Amino acid sequence: MATKYPKFSRDLAQDPTTRRIWYAIATGNDFESHDGMTEENLYQKIFATHFGHVAIIFLWASSLLFHVAWQGNFEQWIKDPLHIRPIAHAIWDPHFGKPAIEAFSQGGANYPVNIAYSGVYHWWYTIGMRTNNDLYQGSVFLLLLAALFLFAGWLHLQPKFRPSLTWFKSAEPRLNHHLAGLFGVSSLAWAGHLIHVAIPESRGVHVGWRNFLTTLPHPAGLTPFWTGNWGVYAQNADTTGHIFGTSQGAGTAILTFLGGFHPQTESLWLTDMAHHHLAIAVIFIIAGHMYRTNFGIGHSIKEMLNAKQFFGIRTEGQFNLPHQGLYDTYNNSLHFQLSIHLAALGTALSLVAQHMYSLPPYAFIAKDYTTQAALYTHHQYIAGFLMIGAFAHAGIFWIRDYDPEQNQGNVLDRVLKHKEAIISHLSWVSLFLGFHTLGIYVHNDVVVAFGTPEKQILIEPVFAQFIQAAHGKLLYGMDTLLSNPDSIAYTAWPNHANVWLPNWLDAINSGTNSLFLTIGPGDFLVHHAIALGLHTTTLICVKGALDARGTKLMPDKKDFGFTFPCDGPGRGGTCQTSSWEQSFYLALFWMLNLLGWVTFYWHWKHLGVWQGNVAQFNENSTYLMGWFRDYLWANSAQLINGYNPYGTNNLSVWAWMFLFGHLVWATGFMFLISWRGYWQELIETLVWAHERTPLANLVRWKDKPVALSIVQGWLVGLAHFTVGYILTYAAFLIASTAGKFG
């Protein structure tokens, strides 16, 4: 008899009901719970999947390069990046009639195409690619690399090439290799690429495989390096009149500290970025030699964490949180490690979102408004999902991997012991922010509705304006630090030589970029709305993790695992008690809610900056109807009109996605509100009808149909809610921005 799915669980494979499929999907990635899984095998499997993951990333990047080279307009776009729309790929759609074919033949193409809003054109242009041939070469190279990684993944599953458990548990060597090798050397390699290829290309000098060993990136060669006269590399930078991609106004410097933006491309100076990556490389390569390996020199992390002395001073006291036992707890728990890594990566991605628009690194991307909006939203959403993952795995860690004996008196133990104080403080601050922010919005809404807008409560964000002024923004007239030429920020070493200040001060005060946007009462309010979203999401996440082991309602919770059905025997009222339901399921709704506010704010604020009409945001963002009417409703116009009785336009696909997204989102509520009994009865009715319908009853299935559990229903609801939410806003964002700016 053929083995039924899933092969990883004999118990599930023998389940006679459709539960078999549901539970198999739910536990497919929970390798720990699979039959015959050992700790060593677990580490080996996860290690091998990393190679597959990297291969998929290379394959994806390769496909972008290939399709743009084949069907895009990269070479035409380079000639006029501000006015030509970059093409992602062609569209072949049998449904397209003549109007659709005409509408989607855009970006200079004579056949239907999709416009690219990912910023890859700007990236490839900045790093020195100039021809379709360059793109094809990159594509083939990445394809070969992907194949190599797939082979490496397969190889590391073979008995002879499987690393041992001790190898996986060697924290110090891994840290050294990742710091020096992964971050350090790759940053050095990137600095090398920028200096040897990208900077010469930006000055009209082509560097390819044939001449890159013979073309000096700097006229003085390596002499200044060997003689310690490094300042030579910063002399003769590109002038403010430099035309990117040509020798006009170009200098010879390769490592600079100019600050601000290249006037023509409105992106960071390539020579500044090369300097940055070189500095990062040096720091990380040094950091990768700090930890003790086979040679007996360097730091032992375990010794440092368990130390009671810090440079001869006793460290264990009320405020010096002791870390004894943390090394083994962390090193032996994959969930603990994953939790911290997800939290760190999530934070980094949110920082990427904030910096990509305010300090654009790629040439001309600052003026591709739709791409700017798409990239900001994309990175903030991914950051949100990663942060939820961090807390979900923290919950699993507390249940499966935490040992109270091993962690007595350390940070983990202390956090657990005063979790009530942490959770109640988060609750208090969420309530405070929620009532006060909503109270002011509602008050303002009412007085505007009654025709007395002058009675609004409008609060200037003076502290935030002070911080902006301290960084050099002159508009507020605060005359402090960098906005005051006589202050210590100006006169102190090393800035008395004005290394980077002139360009930075020009940039921060230009008014046409996104650096330190001018803020007022509308920003003050939405800032606190976002703070409410952040604190509420944090409350749910932290409570889900810290209450995972047990609460007053359910003291033995940890014995039930990370997720369990609600209202078990004799446990009425225990729905939404499991760590899964709190740290993952409930937290996701608030995470999405928060991301809505963050992206609405960013987008509406920027529409005003880009259109030269900042008054609309400033005047209408202080009351609720302003957000509904002047941001959401007004910007939905293009979407609602995407296809109409008079034909179609190139926004019609987004208009369709906008409608479809709403449908998917609304479907979620059907699963979120109706519980198990409804689904069981519905399924039984459908089965009854199926078995009595001629022809249809020729098809039978062996599994007895069983309805979703409440928790499974919620998961289906959550999936629809999330996907619909994202589809709806993505379509809205792209169409409303592209509709205005072409």
UniProtKB/Swiss-Prot annotation:
**From the UniProt record, which GO molecular function terms apply?**
4 iron, 4 sulfur cluster binding; chlorophyll binding; electron transfer activity; magnesium ion binding; oxidoreductase activity
Q: What does the cofactor section's free text say about binding?
A: PSI electron transfer chain: 5 chlorophyll a, 1 chlorophyll a', 2 phylloquinones and 3 4Fe-4S clusters. PSI core antenna: 90 chlorophyll a, 22 carotenoids, 3 phospholipids and 1 galactolipid. P700 is a chlorophyll a/chlorophyll a' dimer, A0 is one or more chlorophyll a, A1 is one or both phylloquinones and FX is a shared 4Fe-4S iron-sulfur center.
Protein family per UniProt: Belongs to the PsaA/PsaB family.
Catalysed transformations (reactions): reduced [plastocyanin] + hnu + oxidized [2Fe-2S]-[ferredoxin] = oxidized [plastocyanin] + reduced [2Fe-2S]-[ferredoxin]
What protein name is recorded for this chain?
Photosystem I P700 chlorophyll a apoprotein A2 2
* Functional note: PsaA and PsaB bind P700, the primary electron donor of photosystem I (PSI), as well as the electron acceptors A0, A1 and FX. PSI is a plastocyanin/cytochrome c6-ferredoxin oxidoreductase, converting photonic excitation into a charge separation, which transfers an electron from the donor P700 chlorophyll pair to the spectroscopically characterized acceptors A0, A1, FX, FA and FB in turn. Oxidized P700 is reduced on the lumenal side of the thylakoid membrane by plastocyanin or cytochrome c6.
Q: What broad class of enzyme is this?
A: oxidoreductase
Location(s), subcellular? Cellular thylakoid membrane
Q: How does it sit in the membrane?
A: Multi-pass membrane protein
- Ranges that cross the membrane: 46-69, 135-158, 175-199, 273-291, 334-357, 373-399, 421-443, 524-542, 583-604, 651-673, 715-735
Indicate which residues the UniProt annotation says bind chlorophyll a B3.
M670, Y678
Quaternary assembly: The PsaA/B heterodimer binds the P700 chlorophyll special pair and subsequent electron acceptors. PSI consists of a core antenna complex that captures photons, and an electron transfer chain that converts photonic excitation into a charge separation. The cyanobacterial PSI reaction center is composed of one copy each of PsaA,B,C,D,E,F,I,J,K,L,M and X, and forms trimeric complexes.
